[in-house]
Curated annotation (Swiss-Prot):
3-phosphoshikimate binds at K20, S21, R25, S166, Q168, D312, K339. This is 3-phosphoshikimate 1-carboxyvinyltransferase. The active site is at D312 (proton acceptor). It catalyses: 3-phosphoshikimate + phosphoenolpyruvate = 5-O-(1-carboxyvinyl)-3-phosphoshikimate + phosphate. Its main location: cytoplasm. Belongs to the EPSP synthase family. The keyword Cytoplasm applies. It comes from Streptococcus thermophilus (strain CNRZ 1066). It is found in: Cytoplasm. GO terms for molecular function: 3-phosphoshikimate 1-carboxyvinyltransferase activity. GO terms for cellular component: cytoplasm. Its EC number is 2.5.1.19. GO terms for biological process: amino acid biosynthetic process; aromatic amino acid family biosynthetic process; chorismate biosynthetic process. Phosphoenolpyruvate binds at K20, G92, R120, Q168, R343, R385.
Length: 427
């Protein structure tokens, strides 16, 4: 598709679609609780719809009237063997977390996904699950999907130090540990997003978190809850950057989730001199209104323990760095290589094709700014975040057209992205 270029300014306010991580987990916990859980403001992107369909296939009744989702929970002991293979679509969250849910189920399942998911390694989940007594096999020595799995009703608890900083792996092991005989200990490499831990407590469960150590006992039961999903900061990130780099812009984003494990991008924007303000802060819902406006930016260094707090925002942060004076270095981000695409290479290739100065490294990128951007053809390779990054980059283009291939990938997490963009262009 041909993208909008030569933006004169972005103005207006947006309510950001529901957080993808919390939407996935609300379906999972709602299914595993006893009673009817209601979820408001859920994200209806393709990944979340995949999770919803999988739990229906496992025997859970889920009603969606377009406003509220109602989940008739069955508990861990009420899940049924599916009649067919479980389709995870493009969703790494779905296949990894649901592997943990199914670890304690005494039936055969096969989980598969699209071409992109079929290239993503699952060994980081399958290795510890095997230690707990699960039979699971995938393709190649990295256990690529499809995965065949038979869980165990007598799962062994685990003491496990995560070799990578991954909220998905941590969450998969937490779901398995909830079904194990005894106490499990999971130790993170770096602190990652804690929505799973928060939701266990919201649904009446218990766990102990001290620093990077999580202790969790098996045999717990959950009680249905009312969940309101805040806006997704990973989706808001595209508008935060657009408001900072497009001339004559001021954007107000309402009801954005500001869980402390997800707000690395706000810290980076402040470090780079961006004009950003938080207001209407709700400490309980962990949400706020965020306002940004066009700013003079300077390069910065991004690495260490901030990386898990902004891993999904690094593509759009890279674009931000191309519009900052001086050098920006991103390091310790090798996890980008096993996302929907190798995001180090694909981001660098896309923005360099448009005139940026980006050198990919083994664990990140070196970006030299400020560079004007020009027209190019860019392929998302099925990665939603590459698509949205390119659409924001196109707004800065004064010379030539930007042709985005496979733009439909954006529907994975933000189906209303282009209509929201139109609103800001004419705000």
């Amino acid at each position: 598709m041909k993208l909008e270029t030569k933006a004169q300014g972005l103005r207006g306010s947006l309510r950001i679609p529901g957080d993808k991580s919390i939407s996935h987990r609300s379906i999972m916990f709602g299914s595993l609780a006893k009673g009817v859980t209601t979820v408001r403001d859920i994200l209806r992107g393709e990944d979340v719809l995949s999770t919803m369909q999988v739990f229906r296939d496992l025997g859970v009744t889920i009603e969606d009237d377009g406003d509220v989702v109602r989940i008739h929970g069955v508990g861990f002991d009420g899940l049924k063997a599916p009649q067919n293979k479980l389709d995870m679509g493009n969703s790494g969250t779905s296949i990894r977390l649901i592997s943990g849910v199914l670890a304690g189920q005494d039936f055969d399942v096969e989980m598969f996904g699209d071409d992109s998911l079929s290239k993503r390694p699952m060994d980081r989940v399958t290795i510890p699950l095997r230690q707990m007594g699960v039979e699971v096999s995938g393709q190649t020595d990295r256990d690529l999907p499809p995965l065949k799995m038979h869980g165990s009703k007598s799962l062994k608890p685990i003491y496990y130090e995560l070799p990578v900083a991954s909220a998905q792996v941590k969450s998969a092991l937490i779901f398995a540990a909830l079904q194990a005989d005894g106490e499990s200990v999971i130790i993170e490499k770096e602190k990652t997003r804690n929505h799973t831990e928060d939701m266990i407590q919201q649904f009446g469960g218990q766990l102990q978190v001290e620093g990077k150590e999580i202790r969790i006992s098996g045999g717990q039961t959950f009680t249905a809850q009312e969940v309101v999903v805040p806006g997704d900061i990973s989706s808001a990130a595209f508008w935060l950057v657009a408001g900072l780099v497009v001339p004559n812009s001021k954007i107000v984003l309402k009801n954005v989730g500001i869980n402390e494990t997800r707000t690395g991008i706000i810290d980076v924007i402040k470090d780079m001199g961006g004009k950003i303000k938080l207001s209407d802060i709700d400490q309980v819902a962990k949400s706020a209104t965020i306002t940004v406006e066009t700013s003079e930016l300077k390069g910065t260094e991004i690495g260490g323990d901030i990386i898990p707090r902004l891993i999904d925002e690094l593509p759009i942060i890279t674009l931000l760095a191309t519009q900052a004076q001086g050098k920006t270095v991103i390091r310790d981000a090798e996890e980008l290589k096993v996302k929907e695409t190798d995001r180090i290479q694909v981001v660098a290739d896309a923005l360099n094709a448009m005139g940026a100065d980006i050198v990919p490294t083994e664990d990140g990128m070196i970006i030299t700014g400020k560079t004007p951007l020009h027209g190019a053809e860019v392929n998302t390779f099925g990665d939603h975040r590459i698509g949205m990054m390119t659409a924001i980059a196109a707004l800065l283009v004064q010379d030539g057209e930007v042709d985005l291939q496979r733009a439909e990938a954006i529907n994975t997490s933000y189906p209303s992205f282009f209509s929201d963009l139109e609103g800001l262009l004419h705000g």
